[in-house]
Amino acid sequence: TAAAQGTVTQATSKSTGVTLNKPAGVITMNNASLATATNATFTLTNSFISANDTVILTLAGGQTTPGSYNVFANALAAGSVSITLRNISGGTLSEAVVINFAVIHCS
């Protein structure tokens, strides 16, 4: 349902953390430049996340050319997860990439 979803926009840079206390939502990243073969990592703070959960991420928009990025979750902890965006395009990009996320409670 719409009440279970939220949106947040990253300020300042691609490494700036965001807070969204919803089980699913949309993160719009900052449009700072990201060189090819480079990672940008930020923290999503979210009270719905526990250390045993799974966070699913999908690139949902903001890309001129689909397939220019990889996105993955790492460093899962109670209340937060680190999200890494990697530029795999072969050139420097300055795009406000949109990431959908969903928290799946595992135990």
Predicted regions and their residues:
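Surface patches in mature domains of proteins
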Residues: 63-76
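Terminal beta-strand-rich extracellular "head" domains
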Residues: 53-64
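Extracellular receptor-binding modules and their adjoining Ser/Thr/Gly/Asp/Asn-rich linkers
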Residues: 1-51, 75-107
